[in-house]
């Protein structure tokens, strides 16, 4: 990251697949780098059961940080976490230790239908907010996104899976 001139501070979530050293031993250095870059926002770590204990052990190297480190342990074979603007789907993979893969999914709303908005006499000042999913009210009349949006469009899904044997998905 440093070679590319990228700061780690925009990172809000780090997901761990499993606890082999080649997948987790870089965490103390990353935490210290974030602290040295004056990060103050909390950092969320997601991983298999035991994550809290593993992170506490690694924090011996990085005991004092100017930001909070939160841990979420995956408790099921498949688990979904919802965040603003996307969801994270964790799924169990076939490895010799408890191991997960992750899919980040960004859904997309339907296209804005200008003709439907005009037919229903929806004020133009509300169009962009309705398109963003807001429900609005004016003079006792309620305007909802489904009044002006078409069918949901295909979204974006990026999957990361490592250290796994072939398996049915």
Residue ranges and their predicted role:
Residues 19, 49-50, 162-164:
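Active-site metal-binding loops of divalent metal-dependent hydrolases
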Residues 84-169:
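Active-site-proximal loop/helix segment associated with metal-binding centers of metalloenzymes
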Residues 1-46, 68-78:
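Active-site metal-binding motif and surrounding structural segment of the metallo-beta-lactamase
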Residues 23-26, 53-55, 169:
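Phosphate- and divalent-cation-binding pockets in alpha/beta enzyme and binding domains
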Residues 52-59, 74-76:
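A gly/proline- and charged-residue-enriched helix-loop-helix capping module
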Residues 64-67, 71-97:
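Charged mid-protein connector segments
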Residues 49, 75-76, 106-108:
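Non-catalytic surface loops within mature trypsin-like serine protease
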